[in-house]
């Protein structure tokens, strides 16, 4: 495997882990994806949140910080 392939796998694994954690926290808060979209004035669209949670999309650090703030957790908890 090439270095770029390893990096892609690492990014994919990271995206999945963060996504799983995002879903766990959202569900602990008893929020639907639509609830998050509404409560954030559509900053976090339900479709995009779903992609983050499935690990299909990488979330940027600034967005991760805003989402952690919304959920009332630290970035480390995500």
Where on the chain are the PLM-derived regions?
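Short alpha-helical DNA-recognition segment
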Residues: 29-51
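A short, Lys/Arg-rich alpha-helix, primarily the initiator
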Residues: 2-29
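Short alpha-helical elements of helix-turn-helix
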Residues: 20, 46, 61-64
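Generic non-transmembrane alpha-helical segments
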Residues: 21, 25, 39-40, 70-73
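Short, conserved catalytic or interaction motifs in soluble domains
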Residues: 54
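DNA major-groove recognition helix of helix-turn-helix/homeodomain DNA-binding modules
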Residues: 62-77
